[in-house]
């Protein structure tokens, strides 16, 4: 009897890979993350930088549209012009003629700067202020020039030494006449005011004051006395003259034609008429 070889076959048949043994003991299940956690979050922090500009833009647009609506009702024609200030040399009518071209505009569109410029071009106006007063008024404040002296034959000087030229210049021949280089108007006015103050206690007023191109000073009093001062120590020389005048010249003033202060320690006197012996003695005392 032929022998037969029997082989033990694993269940599952031929050609199958052996199964891995199952792990023994307990196993842990890992829960899956929610979709909202796994997806990247949107960053909206940039919106806070846009909030204020956006708000301002909205407010600005609202104000603009509101103004467009209100302006036709608020922007009225100019109904009244008031002029303030003490006016001695210019008239209300002259002011009205100057500003009349501007009054056709409305309350908000009137050119205040242009109106002020036109007013300050008038020779007698030193300074002008123009402002609106709700709802339909313009108020003008004017400061007139204060003429102190004549500047040669061509202009007047105010108290700041600023020249101005009114049409009626011939009406001010009574004012003292100042002369000097054009660049020295303010300096000459300051010197005039100072010397006038020093001479006033003697009863003298200045009719003419001149500054030469080299800086020398000379004046003529209203009494007709010429005083040569020179360039240096002007105030000291005038004070010396005041002191000597009270002591030796007061009684002879009507006979004095010219006084020369261009000496370091004295003065020289030129007389109108031939001097008497007493006058000669006086003149010798002050030289």
From Swiss-Prot:
Subcellular compartments: Cell inner membrane
Periplasmic side: 65-287
All residue ranges annotated as the POTRA domain in the record: 76-145
Gene3D superfamilies from the UniProt entry: Cell division protein FtsQ/DivIB, membrane protein fhac
Domain of life, source organism: Bacteria
Topology term for the membrane: Single-pass type II membrane protein
TM region positions: 46-64
Disulfide cross-links: none
Cytoplasmic side: 1-45
Entry keyword set: Cell cycle, Cell division, Cell inner membrane, Cell membrane, Membrane, Transmembrane, Transmembrane helix
Disulfide bond as UniProt keyword: no
Stored Pfam families: FtsQ_DivIB_C, POTRA_1
Gene Ontology CC: cell division site; FtsQBL complex; plasma membrane
HAMAP family, per the entry: FtsQ_subfam
Described purpose of this protein according to its UniProt entry: Essential cell division protein. May link together the upstream cell division proteins, which are predominantly cytoplasmic, with the downstream cell division proteins, which are predominantly periplasmic. May control correct divisome assembly.
Quaternary data: Part of a complex composed of FtsB, FtsL and FtsQ.
Family statement drawn from the similarity comment of this UniProt entry: Belongs to the FtsQ/DivIB family. FtsQ subfamily.
Name of the protein this chain belongs to: Cell division protein FtsQ
Organism: Pseudomonas aeruginosa (strain ATCC 15692 / DSM 22644 / CIP 104116 / JCM 14847 / LMG 12228 / 1C / PRS 101 / PAO1)
Lineage: Bacteria, Pseudomonadati, Pseudomonadota, Gammaproteobacteria, Pseudomonadales
